[in-house]
UniProtKB/Swiss-Prot annotation:
Gene Ontology MF term list: endopeptidase activity
Function: Non-catalytic component of the 20S core proteasome complex involved in the proteolytic degradation of most intracellular proteins. This complex plays numerous essential roles within the cell by associating with different regulatory particles. Associated with two 19S regulatory particles, forms the 26S proteasome and thus participates in the ATP-dependent degradation of ubiquitinated proteins.
Name of protein: Proteasome subunit beta type-3
Species this protein is from: Mus musculus (Mouse)
Biological process annotations from GO: proteasome-mediated ubiquitin-dependent protein catabolic process; protein catabolic process
Any one of the GO CC terms: proteasome core complex
Gene that encodes the chain: Psmb3
Chief place of localization: cytoplasm
Subunit structure: The 26S proteasome consists of a 20S proteasome core and two 19S regulatory subunits. The 20S proteasome core is a barrel-shaped complex made of 28 subunits that are arranged in four stacked rings. The two outer rings are each formed by seven alpha subunits, and the two inner rings are formed by seven beta subunits. The proteolytic activity is exerted by three beta-subunits PSMB5, PSMB6 and PSMB7.
Family per record: Belongs to the peptidase T1B family.
Amino acid sequence: MSIMSYNGGAVMAMKGKNCVAIAADRRFGIQAQMVTTDFQKIFPMGDRLYIGLAGLATDVQTVAQRLKFRLNLYELKEGRQIKPYTLMSMVANLLYEKRFGPYYTEPVIAGLDPKTFKPFICSLDLIGCPMVTDDFVVSGTCSEQMYGMCESLWEPNMDPEHLFETISQAMLNAVDRDAVSGMGVIVHVIEKDKITTRTLKARMD
């Protein structure tokens, strides 16, 4: 069994028209054993910027803490909020530093540029190789199922409500086909003037 699927989990981000959405499941388990149903996998990195971490739960928390430390230093030094592209470079550096004994987590970044409000999504592998796309990115144990659902449902230029509906359906249907993720979904829809966070109920088995 892969160490990446030891705790399970799924994270997804999707781009809309002047908005982005990021979603994650809520399960934390040890293989088939369930531990909790409210595990945090999405962390705020700015006013309109989030990172989702799927993989080994200990590394999820470690990477989130180390990233927050680097982010605070950056904001103190620069005196401004970090741009999504810069955060991607910061995460890539953090992961690549540990390439010979990596953090077992595959991050997903979603947010809007603090000045231009341009939507941005990307994913990285466990040694920090980034992939920036214009549609959607996925990470976690049921990535094949998530890719299938996203390919079917995603459309360009979706408004925030349509984007929420699409990412929710894709996420709920994908985690239903995976034994080690699920137990509810949390969705953040990021717009220029507001962030909407919703928690969805899913199958609890």
